[in-house]
Regions:
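Rossmann-fold dinucleotide-binding core
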Residues: 93-191
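Electropositive phosphate-/nucleotide-binding environments in soluble metabolic enzymes
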Residues: 1, 21, 47, 63-66, ...
């Protein structure tokens, strides 16, 4: 919804799709989401009819939880036209297939007109029109140009790249890293310890990008360092906040209630990236440790020990 504000401010006609009739009725009635403080303009169409929303649309922005991208893109394929462009704003890895979202959509829709948009931005900052930057990854010049034309303005900067896999790795794994960074905060460690952890994580992410065929320079992009720094240092990040609750030693009930009432993409991605690393025989000890803390209930204090002993 925050991204919709950019397109709207750039004089684009906006249609929003949801699969929930209740959500549609609530948004139409209140013209506001309970998730972010954004007054939805009255001329933005809100519908549960995907055909209606996709018809005569130039750019289709995919901004839904990663686990629904597969089923949603299969439905989208019924109405997609070859001259349309898909802009992926969702982040994550599908658990069963271990595929990134670009590949999932490519498998379901026969088009190269797909871009991945990613960067260090929070929804409220987008809505408040402060200067922000995005990386836009696509192999299609047409796709990059049409999305940039619709999004760039005097407060939104777009940098182009062809490194789709590197952009998706950064956007996905940063949510997992943010959980661990929040744990350090929850245990009472200062920002100095967090920056040590973030720096070590950047080295590991860069190595993963290279191992999966991406461009290691992507780590220095808006989608890389920019998004990782933001997500790993702010309580506005849901993933960071979850980690902080764990680090503070909150009860299982309190933690589970937070998870139940909040979208935590880092948890979903943690299981996916763990499986991906195993399948590809790639070593990334920091992911194994975060997994052990969250799933196998190891003490969060193992994080600092790991950082000191890490080669």
């Amino acid at each position: 919804m925050a991204l919709a504000s950019i397109f709207y401010n750039n004089k684009c006609n906006i249609k929003m799709w949801t699969n929930s009739e209740d959500e549609k009725d609530m948004l139409i009635k209140n013209r506001k989401s309970d998730k972010i403080n954004y007054n939805i303009p009255s001329d933005i169409i809100i519908s549960t009819d995907m055909k209606e929303v996709v018809l005569n649309t130039d750019i289709i922005v995919v901004a839904i939880p990663a686990k629904f991208v597969g089923s949603t893109s299969k439905e989208l394929n019924k109405y997609f036209k070859s001259n349309q462009v898909i802009c992926i704003a969702s982040k994550g890895i599908e658990q069963n297939s271990c595929l990134f979202l670009y590949d999932i959509i490519r498998n379901n829709i026969d088009t190269l007109n797909i871009g991945v948009i990613s960067g260090g931005t929070f929804a409220e900052d987008i809505i408040n029109m402060v200067p922000i930057g995005f990386s836009l990854a696509s192999r299609s010049n047409y796709t990059r140009n049409i999305i940039t034309k619709a999004m760039a303005n005097d407060y939104v900067k777009i940098r182009h790249t062809r490194d789709i896999i590197g952009t998706e790795i950064c956007g996905s794994i940063k949510n997992v890293i943010a959980i661990a960074s929040g744990m350090l905060d929850g245990m009472g460690y200062p920002i100095s310890t967090s920056t040590m952890f973030i720096t070590e994580s950047l080295h590991d992410i860069k190595a993963l990008i290279k191992a999966l065929g991406g461009n290691k320079k992507t780590i220095l992009s808006f989608a890389g360092f920019g998004d990782i720094l933001l997500t790993c240092t702010s309580t506005k990040s849901r993933n960071y906040t979850l980690g902080k609750l764990i680090g503070e030693g909150k009860s299982k009930e309190e933690i589970n209630n937070y998870i139940k009432n909040t979208t935590i993409e880092g948890l979903y991605t943690l299981y996916s990236i763990k499986k991906l690393l195993r399948n590809k025989k790639i070593k990334m000890p920091i992911i194994n440790l975060i997994y052990d803390i969250i799933v196998n209930e190891k003490e969060p204090s193992n994080l600092t020990k790991f950082l000191i002993e890490k080669e």
